[in-house]
Design a protein with these regions (language model features):
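Flexible hinge/switch segments at interdomain interfaces of large molecular machines
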Residues: 2-5, 23, 65-67, 102-108, ...
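Residue-level signature of catalytic and energy-coupling elements of molecular machines
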Residues: 27, 50, 95, 179, ...
């Protein structure tokens, strides 16, 4: 039996209204606090907190490595209270050169592989910041961005990084929120910077004009892109579908037989899954003419060898592999990011404009900070100048007077 002592505090609510409000608050929390990147620095909160925790641990590129368990523990304990097991996979991805076009973390140890092998436990792996991450956090101590309290109000964390380079455009992002998702392609940093320079010189340029500077996605795993229509679509609208192909060449053996050598595969494709799919198509006779599939990948890079039977045309076999396996696959672009805390779909001009506006704000705040410091320093230097101009009189006064009287005289002289 439940005893209710204060019935005036009981509020009658419709369950539909409560569920609607609770679900909306939950979905917005996932969207803003977890799944979608900020258009300014291209990072999700978990990524930003990991990098900031490493910054506080002084894990600069020239310094030593630290255990990932220490980094994950500090991140979880100070900024991201969801446990080290949630933090570690995010840390690992920022160190994988097949996941990010420009990695933000320099990992030491087993950080997984393109075959889908898991990384070693965090107690065995070590990490430090890459130069790219340092550039993202450059001028953080010059009042360039706002800070806010962490989850338990014991310290502060940056709401965004100053971001010297357009991380969202060059590294892309992916995430699934409640009722929406994002899937943004990485690009070549030189091409992106050329596009930004063109925009600064001509802010009236349209999104389609960026095609003169940005050829298309620059996936870290290499490969080819088939056609330009998908690129044009997402440059103009923020949505598009890009067809990717792995890089393959036909080599001839001394005995006259041919083999297909794959050296690059589409982005986000697991190499082991590709091999299994090729074997499956051979067993089901969808692709005929393959006698052997070998993975000869090593330190020199990827090398997947498919031996073609005699009397079969290697080029025909390769075209069937494009058709029936993931050697040809698509990347669906959905440029959704947070703009002032609100999720928006952005075309290329929108993303560049937001980045340029943000950098303008950062540089303005940094300049004001440095000006204030210089003005404070100016007051001290002015005192030095007056002292040097009257050095003989000052020395005479100090020697002839007690300390309090000398201090009073010097203060009047400076005023």
């Amino acid at each position: 039996k439940i005893m209710i002592h204060d019935r005036s505090r009981i509020e009658l609510l419709e369950i539909e209204d409560v569920l609607k409000k609770a679900y909306l608050e939950y979905s917005m929390s996932v969207i803003v606090s977890r799944a979608l990147p900020d258009v300014r620095d291209g990072l999700k909160p978990s990524q930003r907190r990991i990098l900031y925790a490493m910054h506080q641990l002084n894990l600069a590129p020239g310094k030593g490595f630290r255990k990932c368990a220490k980094i994950a523990g500090d991140t979880s304990g100070n900024f991201h209270p969801h446990g080290e097991q949630v933090v570690y996979p995010t840390l690992v991805r920022m160190a994988q050169d097949w996941s990010l076009r420009y990695t933000l973390i320099n990992g030491q140890g087993n950080f997984g592989s393109q075959d889908g092998d898991p990384p070693a436990a965090m107690r065995y792996t070590e990490a430090r910041l890459q130069k790219t991450a340092v550039d993202l956090m450059s001028d953080l101590d010059k009042n360039t961005v706002d800070f806010h309290p962490n989850y338990d109000d014991t310290r502060e964390e940056p709401s965004v990084f100053p971001s010297k380079f357009p991380n969202l455009l060059v590294n892309g992002s992916s995430g699934i929120a409640v009722g929406m998702a994002t899937n943004m392609a990485p690009h070549n940093i030189t091409e992106v910077c050329n596009g930004i320079i063109a925009y600064i010189e001509n802010p009236e340029m349209e999104s389609v004009d960026f095609l003169k500077y940005i050829s298309g996605p620059d996936f870290p795993t290499g490969g080819f892109i088939i056609g330009k229509s998908g690129i044009k679509d997402y440059i103009e609208t923020g949505h598009g579908r890009v067809i990717m192909r792995g890089r393959a060449a036909i080599e001839r053996k001394d005995n006259g037989s041919e083999m297909i050598v794959i050296t690059e595969i589409p982005y986000m494709l697991n190499k082991t899954n590709l091999i299994n799919k090729i074997v499956e198509t051979v067993k089901t006779r969808r692709i005929e003419g393959i006698s052997d599939v070998r993975d000869e990948s090593g330190r020199q890079g990827m090398r997947l060898v498919i031996t073609v039977k005699r009397n079969y045309d290697a080029d025909t076999v390769l075209q069937k592999m494009y058709k029936y396996t993931q050697l040809q696959s698509s990347f669906s672009v959905n440029n959704r990011a947070l703009v002032k805390g609100i999720p928006q779909v952005l075309n290329m001009k929108d993303m560049v404009q937001n980045f340029v506006d943000f950098r303008h704000e950062v540089v303005t705040r940094r300049t004001k900070f440095e000006l204030d410091k210089a003005e404070q320093r100016l007051h001290i230097l002015e005192g030095y100048r007056i002292a040097l101009d009257n050095i003989d009189e000052i020395i005479k006064t100090i020697r002839a007077s007690d300390p309090d009287a000398a201090l009073y005289y010097l203060a009047r002289m400076i005023d």
